[in-house]
Amino acid sequence: MRPWPATRGGERNEPLMGQHWRLISLILTAVFTMAFIRSCSSLSSLVAFTFAGATLPSALAAAPANGTSSSNSPGLPMVINTWGGPFVAATDAAYLALLDEQTSALDAVELGCSTCEANQCDGSVGYGGSPDENCETTLDAMIMDGTTMKSGSVAALRRIKNAIGVARAVLEHTTHTMLAGDLATDFAVTNGFVAEDLTTPESAASCAAWKAGGCQPNYRINTIPDPGSSCGPYVPSEVDSSSQDYATQLLPRGAPEGHDTISMIALHASGTMAAGTSTNGASRKVPGRVGDGPITGSGSYVDSEVGGCGATGDGDIMMRFLPCYQAVESLRLGMSPKAAAEDAVRRMVKKYHAVQSGIVVVNSKGEHGGAGSGWTFTYAYRGGTMNETVVVSVPPLDTGSEF
């Protein structure tokens, strides 16, 4: 398009000098514009100038270019994971290993999660915890490389203690992402892992007491006999999907507590990242149940160019939202780690007001934040030259006025 209208028949022509002055004006405008562009320190400053009056999404408008108002990064290398207390031993093990630069981020995550598996952190990780209805402990785990974006996981793994180790074997010795159940156990044995009973005297006694109490509480709904007062065996009762209260028929009845997972992100001094999770799942679960822990993007997720996320909580709900994938993509859009965590939690709470969740997010610089709902969530981190691990307490989000 011409920068000025062409002269049409019947229109009055501008004087020749006027046309020349318009041309000169355009040339001068172009010269000054180019000078201004060259004076800008970067393209981002030009964009900021051009759109200074534009309205940005609130989570982005509050965050400067680096995603935080002031950096809380301890420096690299760094390890960060869900929960404090007994989980701090895992943080320390992974961090101390990373001080040797020959230890990769994947190595650190595997070591940290396996520490919790061996220590039976809080009874929610490793053998002898969270037995299912048949009194058996099964394990879920995953590990992810933030450079290749490849992950390996195991679900409902039976009779193998080192679930995170088997997950890494899936990553490194197959082109698959997940193996499950008895055949995952077979794979583990052929890769040198030892099959053994994961039941302990404590877990057996706990399950026996649960059965003596009428198998209460449990995760069954819409069955005969009434799962609210009886043990099985259960058969399904009719559910009318056309009824107005269909959604109500699918609600839980007050299931058992206990959804803790170790979910860890490691940042190597070189900037490479890895993430992983390990858990024995929900106590009294229906046999065969798989939680969010081994699901890439739900239990954890990492991209070395952006950051990583770890999650814990009610995995049956959380895996429907892929909160860690959402949080890392929010980092990519410019949110701070804390804002990204809060956004991921709010998306879940909007649909499930009572969901218990905890999200920890860290960007590639080591800046971190967390959010939770339904409980006070904690996360632990150690990095740079820190002499000890710090545990951060995160109160549940106040979302009462949002719904």
Feature map (PLM): residue ranges:
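Alpha/propeptide regions of enzymes that mature by internal proteolysis
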Residues: 60-403
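Generic low-complexity segments that are intrinsically disordered, proline-rich and/or Lys/Arg-biased
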Residues: 1-6, 16, 20-21, 26, ...
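N-terminal signal peptide
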Residues: 32-37, 47-73
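Classical eukaryotic N-terminal signal peptides for Sec-dependent ER targeting/secretion
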Residues: 1-48
